[in-house]
Amino acid sequence: MDDVLPVFLLRLWLAIVWFLMAAGSGSAKDLRIAEVTIATPDVISVEIKDPNFRRGAIIELDGSLPQPVGAWIAHGGTWGMVIGPERRHLRLADTPPAELLDRAVIDQAGEYRLNGQPTITSVYRKSLPYDSGFYQSSSGRSQTAAAMKHQVFLKLSRSLEPGTYTLSWPGDLFPETTFNYDPSVTRALGIRSTQAGHTPEDYSKKAYLAVWVPGGPAAGSVDFGSYGLARFSILDESGSVVYSGDVKLKSLPDAKEPWNGLGSPLIDYAALGEQAVPVIGIETSGAATITVPGHDFQSGERIVLQRLSGAEDAAAVFATVGAVSLETVEILDSQSALPPTVTQGATARRAISANRAGTYVFEMDYSNWMPTQNGRYRIRVDGLGVSDVFQVSSDHWKDIGRSALGGLYNHRSGIALDGRFGFERPAAFVPGLNVEIAESTLPLSFSSHGTLGLVPFEDAANSTWRNGKSAGADYWGGYMDAGDWDRHIVHLRVSRLFLDLLDYLPTDRLRTSYGIPKSSEFLDPELYADTDDLPDLLHEAIWTIDFFRRLQGPDGTIRGGIESAGHPILGTASFLETLPVFTYAPDISSTYTYAAIAGSLARHLQNYGQPDLAVVYMESASRAWEAAEAGISDLDAFYADAVAGLVAGGYSDSEGWPEIRLKLEEEAETLRVVAASSLYRTTGEQKFRTAAEKRLKENWDLYLEKSDAAWDYINSSKTDSGIRQSLENLFKSETALLLEAQETNTYPSMKHPYAPAGWGQGGPPDSGMAQLAMRTHMLTGDNAITGLVLDTLNGLLGANQTGMSLMTGVGTRQILHPLHEDHRAMGVQAPPGIIIYGWAPANAFAYGWIFGPSWSPLAEVGLTSQSQNTKVEPSRFAIPYFENLIEFPDVIIQQEYTVHQTIGPVAALAIYLDGQVDAD
């Protein structure tokens, strides 16, 4: 009990920080100095922020408007965009910053004074977005834009001694800034540590020391060893040292990372410090050459080509220089196709190679520190500075799990969100209330969101695929996928995570209350009567499983989900959706998938003393199994309507059906094994064992649901010992490969070594990797596995090269504007509990509509005086991979997320870690 008050006070402090962030998002602030820190002993770092946007809001009018959805009209001294199915709502415009940092002035090293002396020899700067909004542009269309934060590095003529200093700014940009430098108090920018904390028992506790200075010597890399910084300490709230250790070099800037998922162990970056030269011609027939008058490139060098196809070509082509002449350069090893012609503005410059960090990375391992009491602590690099405060609490991972569960709650569809997890929103997608859901004859498997990808999902509501019927009143619920609002069968992976936690966790943890609704609160009160005492995790699993149970047809088949016929319209909230909404036709794969999870739920309900409810789900699972079995035995008949739609809509001809059929059959056969293993574990029936063993004894793997099949079989009452041993060895070998990859990874990651980087790979672990870690740990008890889980989650929560938490609502420095369309439309703070995808290859987010001409939000071409101060600097292709996080919602591959790829797995892993903490 003695530890309760400090924990409460920290949580209160974090809540206040969160409130201030939320308040700041609603009212513009002036151009301001956000923080003065120390980067290296002889480099001061100052963060400057442009004013943030003043948020607009959604207002309801007395009647409908004649203008179409998306039109801007004058209203009350501002502009509003018409939204909503009845056109009786306006989304009032956000107000962009009125003042931007003058970058040309801030970069003038000779104009600074420190204590009146010209001791600043160089200025380096990194400018990235931190806030965003939208409004009506001068042309009358909707315009998105960003506000920038600037990390300004001031190189000194000598190391900074402890003391009080006054900094005078060039051009009187700011009043004189007085700051005190104390290595035991001043934050060191390069300490990359958790923004959240640890439990005392955590097997692994690590932080990192890394700084990249854009345009600085040695390609911006910083070797802290050259400063003699060799020791670190842990300080308690009084400033006393409670632990000390060595600062150890972990990675060099050019250390190869063979498992980075980028196709090469090192990455090409645009070199800073020299001007790009114009490319005025290209020849691609035969040996590819470019015409570059005045170049000085040498054979064998790497170069980067940009804007080859014009202002909206925001990608880069890296290549090797072959033969050279005075005006031409032969292009070898081009990483992507070259265009037949080039446009004005195309450039070439040298490139360098480095790893994802692009700098020296030092590790501070304090795993041996076992604090005896909860409290607030900091890391100090002796002689440099300190980290942000982090909390030690026995409830730490429980709290992180609760926050992530709150993130899932904040994505529930079909109910009003009541603010219990920091976000309020009216009910959305309720048939008969604010939406009509049409039945489509397009199966999910045939759509662009399914296996075949033959039909754009948007077409599912057009005349080719409409059968004229509306879905029933029960077609509500489930999770919204992420930034958009679709509810897909894949979301059942989240339910599977929570059902498995019921098997993994000690009994006392199953009694934990996370504050989520009981099933009887929103679902059928008769069906779920007397279930309130079930574990919260079971209620959370039921939420999505029940949704798909209600999508089950009379014949037992399952629909793949519900979706809008297009991505969300900017400024339109989910509860004011104007696009057509449809439900996919049943498909065999979705039906097997549901049979597996419903059977698993029935087993758990039986174990928790709910036999009647268990029967409901077991009967539903059996009907799904039988329907899928009938379908797979005659795919021609099952998909006859869908094939007719393909032909009628011109997506395929009848001759393409055999190949399509084969792909559908392969997917269904795999998911048949998943369902059979689950149902065998639940029922013990021989027919399910036979169906499972037939494939499991072959060349099986653990990709996503296939891992479920292996795990369910291993945990069944009677098994073939050879198959079981083979599957157990598969879990162990896959995990061993994952652990081996950490030896060369700059920062820990649960990305599968063979998975390509991006879309979360290398950031939050997906459900498959989360299950792999938990299941292998259950088999082996190997603490190295939980150590990797701890390192990965701490990396997401701040121990990364940005020093930011990638989880909304957690951390002093956190992501504020993920691609969550409701908060953007409503003009409010993003809901807590979202974990974004994070890092991705620069070419993967080279969107021309973002990094293009002057009309784009982060323009790089044809710059006006305004857009000159709103572009990312330095070049996106010069910033190291782990620094290159663009906090702008429409950078989809970084700023989006899904309930099953990021939020659900992080929730499950945090709760699993909580289960490893000794009970009070």
List the predicted regions and their residue ranges.
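Bacterial N-terminal signal peptides
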Residues: R11-A22
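Short Trp-Ser/Thr-centered turn/loop motifs at beta-strand boundaries
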Residues: F174-F179, S264, R380-S394
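Aromatic (Trp/Tyr) and acidic
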Residues: E35-I38, D42-V152, A196-G197, K205-A210, ...
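Low-complexity, Pro/Ser/Thr- and charge-rich linker/hinge segments at domain boundaries
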Residues: Y181-S204, V386-R425
